[in-house]
Amino acid sequence: MSDIETRVKEIVVEQLGVNSEEVANESSFVDDLGADSLDTVELVMALEEAFECEIPDEEAEKISTVQEAINYIKERQG
């Protein structure tokens, strides 16, 4: 597991208040982890802060799973 993957999962656990065992790469923030729209906004903000990047709203709307968040950060950190 990469550092980015580990950190993204830690942020998901912190922001959504779920157990780390529940967080799989294919987990949907809304469908699997019970996030609402405010949760997803706060999650994106936490990712931006942790990885020192900006995620535009139109890009954030496309990030709906843990793996999509990991891929987005990896592409920007490349």
Swiss-Prot record:
Keyword Transport in record: no
GO molecular function, one term: acyl binding
Pfam family, one: PP-binding
Major place of residence: cytoplasm
Subcellular location: Cytoplasm
Superkingdom classification of source: Bacteria
GO cellular component entries: cytosol; membrane
Family: Belongs to the acyl carrier protein (ACP) family.
PANTHER family noted in UniProt: ACYL CARRIER PROTEIN, CARRIER DOMAIN-CONTAINING PROTEIN
Protein name (record): Acyl carrier protein
Species of origin: Nitrosococcus oceani (strain ATCC 19707 / BCRC 17464 / JCM 30415 / NCIMB 11848 / C-107)
Organism ancestry: Bacteria, Pseudomonadati, Pseudomonadota, Gammaproteobacteria, Chromatiales
